[in-house]
Amino acid sequence: MKIYVLGICGTFMGGLAQLAAEKGIKVSGCDENVYPPMDQVLLSNGIAIDEGYNPKNLPKDVDLVVVGNVIARGNPMIEEILNKGIDFISGPEFLSKYLLAKRHVVAISGTHGKTSVSSMVTKVLLDNGVDCGYLIAGRAKDLEATASLGTHEFFIIEADEYDTAFFDKRSKFIHYHPKTLLINNLEFDHADIFSSLSDIKKQFHHLLRLMSSTSTLIFPEHNINIKNVMKMGFYSQSLPFNTKFTRGWHAKKVTADSSKFDIYKDNKKKASISWSSIGEHSLQNGLASYLVCKSLGLKSKDIAESLSEFKGVTRRMDLVGDKSSVKVYDDFAHHPTAIKYTLEGLRKKVGSEKIICLLEMRSNTMLSGYHDKKIPKAVASADQVFIFSKDKKQISTLESESNNIEACSTTQEFLRKLSSLELENTHLICLSNGSFDGIHQAILERI
């Protein structure tokens, strides 16, 4: 079989291409921007890449074109495919049909923590001799790659709710048919494709309706949104947990920053975790990962030992530099809840030392202004906050809600202010779901 992948350098599509090549399928593809590290990963797997979407690059003997969700009508390659009647399929459907068939799919979903939990579960399984397959939309420091076919029936996939393709507006995870599903949390996000939280709930409900009666849903029982989705119709087994109450499966932090915590079932302690991750969101991720692995048959002691050695995921409280008593961090947080827990975790770790937060309003939901009223409370743990936005109305709203928020329209504007800031014993954290114009290194070069 010979496939051609459109949008091949994206994390998901690039991982899919690697899996297909590992399966013995002949793979090539194209993308608008061909850049490291994905281009080198693909080339090392014998996958040829064309830059741009020139229809002339489409192999004449291709059996199937796999279309990424960044591809829209009007793309010259898509128009060529439609005009000539060439067979095409979405990435998630291809994955389901050709790579996940007869696998025990373990889907990690939710608004936050998908990459971290997927990485944790994969690490624990591999550490315990389970050669699982996996596809993760981020780079875990404990794993050699972001995707592997594996030989065991278990396949771990980061299952997001974003739409499948221009011709299939259902969420990607609809295609995966998991036997084990974690919904770690559920809030409004992706304002570019969802108009309300109800729209997102419908997609999660569609996912639950496709699960068999022998499948298992793992979820935090204190999350009202998830419970409301279940009330719409739920037919599988459930394994609830919580971080708010001391009943059933739950966790108790031992240290204020949650870098040490114990896991209980009712009143009986089952495991103790001591790791480098911090924050209550990390505690919940750890508890969820533990229960996913427990449901797959692993022993508590083995799970705890592996999780305690978890090194983390790139762009999750990543210390990118430590210079002149200033620590500079990079973090992917771009939703008020994730921002809040990230900054609270850092505050509990560093005590009274100064925290400066740089927040780029980059995601579609953040740019829409939907979260403007929540941002001031989310960043309250920081001493000083610089919001990067060019929306004057948004800036006015944010500055009026908090005395420690200051606006910057560009990274250069902030860098000009840098020399006037008191930086001794400071933790400077940059929050964005993009590259932030390389501001982390620019700061380190100037201090």
Model-flagged regions — what are they?
Residues E32-Y35, Y53-P55, N69-R73, E93, ...:
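Short, polar loop motifs at secondary-structure junctions
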Residues E51-Y53, S90-P92, I136-G138, F219-E221, ...:
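Short loop/edge segments at beta-strand edges and connector loops
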Residues K253-K269:
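Acidic-glycine-rich active-site phosphate/pyrophosphate-binding loop
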